[in-house]
């Protein structure tokens, strides 16, 4: 009984931090205009990217991941001229629909960013990889990709987030 108030307090602090992060992201996004903002502007607003992918055309894609606690992953493209050309939140149904059986784990990682959780199942020789996201304005969901022993997609599913505090 003594631990319950502490658990509730920790949950409220975590929720407050998450809401602050979302608000900060919205402010950062509002301050960046495609075709105008520079790489320096992006880094000033979002900090150092977690991952940088070099594209064949000379552009680079910066990943700003909000997993495991958040429900968004941002990918920001900076063109060869140093200007931001795209800012996308990649955890969405359109991107999930691109995940097809046979795709490699690396291809999925590149499309969706770092996941919230990876769970290997030795007996079935499968690995379940989960991304937390919002469906609509406030429905917490998990997009799960199941990989076989060869690290290729077997199947996908979207389910309600069991860790979400729905009231």
Regions found by a protein language model. Give the residues of each.
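Sec-dependent bacterial lipoprotein signal peptides
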Residues: 1-22
